[in-house]
């Protein structure tokens, strides 16, 4: 066996072992090493839609020993697994926990009805069906139920006590609205850097909430009074306990904060267990959920890395060998020109991000223009991809007209298979597509094996690699793949590795890493500037967020203020990682096609498999 073949097989085997061990360990942590039974249940609502929910049942819970229970609801664009920090830590302390996927999220069906969400006070996205099911379970103490939710989930949580007044005894709001003053035993986890103005009563500084009339009313205090952070008011015995906890975190990442989880867990103990922890009680600050999150990231990254040895092994075969073409090495812009091109591209991306993404998201115009565009957040991403591709493609056309006079051909930008003429070798291109399909199916099946056997998705703090829960989501994948392919072929292809082609360094390894760093600058620096404008003044003690009162050429950017800057916490690290693989694929094949296919496929898999969709 060839030495390189042996090394690639060894690398693949080691990676699969690491992934398997990480998934099994994550499963063990989730179940507190066998002390909690974890399963996914499916509940059908009155409209016939399926509500998928993750159920945590501690050892000892039975009809003769029913335990208090908590319904744990996720936020917009999230799913049941995002709430794992609360679910895991509650269950290992003696609470039955049910974490549903709201309608249109995760594995649930139905789609989100935005009109009902904002107009019907009884619409809770299927979570009432989940709670009704939970109450009927024999191992649940139906008279001691808690509800909690993050963001949108919190908006649902405050409605449930009115629908189940005899059951719900406690409410925990995680970066959400306070609800009515009549709510039983209310804990508000207030994110210091909450991007959503409504969740901080539109105050420029969260610290000023201590004198908010709305919050004073929610806590049952006099209108002229002042709230003390992390102080409990009222009594658990009569349901008037109130507390507003200050969490030094932004909206999205609040569930990952130790203090958030500790506050919520202890609140449920005080409200649902009369302050007694019982034999399963553990200090609320002693938490294990983060180990599961880290292991999930290892499975996610490890699965992507398996593309390298598999690609190398397939390119060693006679059939796929032609896919590995020599890299073009005739055209290189000088150092100064490269930095100008990269900076211009970065700035264009930074400018287009707020201008285009707001056409998606809640109330975005794209869903109004195209009835088939059901992924609300996906619409904003697609608009960003298309706009960048159009601008970069237009600039490339003008550049190429002049570059041709200097002998540059489409071969030099990784497009043509002939050095002089623009020629596509459809046989090689077909094999390239087949190779990409094999790589994608490998990752999809690998994730599926462990999702089916251990219940573990490959993710960190956000839905990434997971199985498509319906044919509808598969359809979304192919619809939104088109704008992504356009972006990665033009911006992530002919621009990066053609128009802005970089020179080789002393070794292939150094070239890979240096190219990657420069690609990150060219493709991500503009997004980082947007992130910095939104957050840095806020983080450094000023008022925020940065875009809240900004207009751009008479355009109101209020739609952009909250959700889309928040998503940069997801997109910036995601892009940084994906661009490493994009660079590797170009260097390995000498063409832009395989990299564009794989990276757009991954990006849209992450988006379509778990993203919110509309009815």
Report residues per predicted region.
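Hydrophobic alpha-helical transmembrane segments in integral membrane proteins
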Residues: 23-35, 612-615
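Soluble extramembrane regions of membrane proteins in the secretory/endomembrane system
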Residues: 30-289
